[in-house]
Amino acid sequence: EYETEMEKGGEVALEQFHITRLIHPAFNVRAGHMIVPVGLTNAHHEPINFFGTVRPEGETTILPSTWHETGIEFFGTLGKGYATFDYQVLVVAGLNANGFDRNTWVASGKQGLFEEDNFNSPGYVLRVDYRGVPGLRVGGSFYYCANTAGNSDKPNFYEGQKAPLRIYSGDLQYKNDYVTARANVVYGNLTNSKFISSKNVRLSNNASYSRVVPVAKNAVSYAGEVGVNLRSIFNHNPKVPVIYPFARYEYYNPQEKGEAGQTMDLRNKVSMWVAGLNWFALPNLVVKADYTTRQIGTGKMFGTGPYTSENEFSIGLAYIGWFFKK
């Protein structure tokens, strides 16, 4: 019996698919499709790891989220006691400058739009987390791609010009029975952003890229949140539900600074507050509700911006299941 298909078949999209070889606590190897641990949200993207009904807005505006690429990773744990560190070193497919734009900086540069990824200029990632104090984790990450223009869909689209990208991030979390606190900062630098902008505005209308420019030289995001476990106030009485009232502040701007001759859009500068509740019905099941207010065009923590503010109320339900057993 002979069968043939005239139209293209479907495909399966995976966030992670890799093979891991555990060699020693201090050195292990992973190869395949994996998370790129740049920033707090990508490294800890499950919804029980942030209080809001949606992922932190700043990081997910300027960085891919969830950021996953194909490559190889070396990881392990060094030291012991108060001098315990986890590390990750990755070489992955680099970001594609075709996806860089005004409103999301490099967030849309993640590869995967087509069936093949370009590995002409790989991305190099280093992440280190300090875990020596119980309940405390302090981390930092660095991403470097020597030429994001080299990963363009068309090899000569950027006429041989280079566009190096550097992303720096730092984050921390402190968690005990009473309180959970998190903070993070991301700063990015794109060289030759003015030239990238001049080319991206001329991308084909048939492409799915936004073509909205200019792409900024620098982007930034920083945030902090604190939640209090109400059950702890009642001596951890099991009859009291596990509810965390929380507050979160974020500032982000995908157009923090441009090159000479570039005009940045003030509307991309956002200062925002989020307040709400998280009810953990189960350790891995959380019901969320929050209220958000965004001030547009200002970096001030308090006060209003020159544009109309945005206010919204959200409710969410999240369940995390990594493994299942009878």
Where is each model-derived feature located?
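A short secondary-structure junction signal
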Residues: T84-Y87, N98-T104, S141, N151-D153
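Active-site rim elements
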Residues: E59-T61, G112-E115, V212
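Outer membrane beta-barrel
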Residues: E1-A97, N120-V125, D129-R137, N218, ...
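Loop-centered beta-sheet repeat module
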Residues: W105-N151
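Outer-membrane beta-barrel pore domains
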Residues: F17-R21, N42-H44, G139-K326
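Active-site glycine- and acidic-residue-rich loops that bind
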Residues: S65, E115-P122, G160-P164
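Short glycine/proline- and charge-enriched loop/turn segments
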Residues: I48-P56, V106-G109, N200-N205
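Short leucine-rich amphipathic alpha-helices used at interfaces
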Residues: E5, I48-N49, A107-S108, F114, ...
